[in-house]
Amino acid sequence: MHTMLRKISLAFLSALIFQAQPVSAQITGGQQVFQFMTLSPSARITALGGAQIAVKDDDLAFAAANPAALNPQMDGMLTFQHNFFLTDIQHGYVAYAQHVPKLGFTFHGGLQYMNYGDINQADEYGTVIGKVKASETAFTVGGARPLTDRISLGLNVRLGLSTLDTYKASALAADAGLMYADTASRFIAAVVVRNAGAQLSSYNEVREDLPFDLQIGISKQLRYLPFRLSIIAHHLQQWNIRHNDPNLQDDGILQLGDTQSSTGGGNNAVDNFFRHLVFNGEFLLGRNESFRIRVGYNHLRKKELSVRNYRSLAGFSGGIGIRISRFRIDLGYAAYHLAGGVVHLGIGTRLKDFF
């Protein structure tokens, strides 16, 4: 039974990857719709550079990034995450999980929201004639089960809805993940296919691509130091993810100032390689790892959002997490641009602890 399930799971994961390949030719901004589904679902992930698929504990928010992270430790967990995004945009995620022992599955349901607030409505002369509202929502359900003692499989199905004044659009997407977790060596490896799917309806009857993303991640908790180091590779379905601007010259790979170039083939290849990577680390301190310090670096964000000749911390992130009584509280900050960054707050608890 388990052998057959593993074969079906691997075949399904492969089908998702190859089905989505033709529609994922570009990741440049403006090329895909429902981009809000790519945002970090939690304060912890925000602090870790915006990507983390290789952790398996009781943090339910990880299931939004990798459904294979679902496990019995999340039974009865409720999480609420709110992101104070740029320009007063409000973004958040709320979810609940339940383990079903008879089936061997852990299920979860979640709601992601993005509220852009009121936007000025103007006529062809630029005269403001009113206000319009814009928002996006995604409903997610998913489940996971172990295939072996170390390998688990998970699947999410997501319905996305978008509203701009009287215009509406919808999309159906799926995530599939496999995770290998060796508890003895504290090593985890994972592969995830995210947002494979298509639009169901659009604003103007023109169907556009969803933000498909193939990710591979590894994490290792050190033996003699309470520290977990992770490397997450993203957008692996496309090698070249550089945005070449001939007006800019790149003098290096990791410099604090800005950025982008269409020259210097050797440096460009190295730079492009690192744009696929997110590096992060997490200190696990105190009894039961109740206090955590997190740092992250997202090279793609650094290179795309830095301003030439100005030093900034774009691409860097950090945060803390603490357990107080029955609650897990997380705070994350990510520097996006000289104009500012985002603050992410998360609260999680186990409902069964109150009854």
What is the predicted role of each segment?
Residues 9-19:
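Bacterial N-terminal signal peptides
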Residues 26-355:
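Subset of outer-membrane beta-barrel
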Residues 19-25:
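Sec/Tat signal peptide C-region and signal peptidase I cleavage site
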Residues 1-5:
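N-terminal secretory signal peptides that target proteins for export/translocation
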Residues 8-11, 335-337:
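Short alpha-helical "patches" and their helix-cap loops
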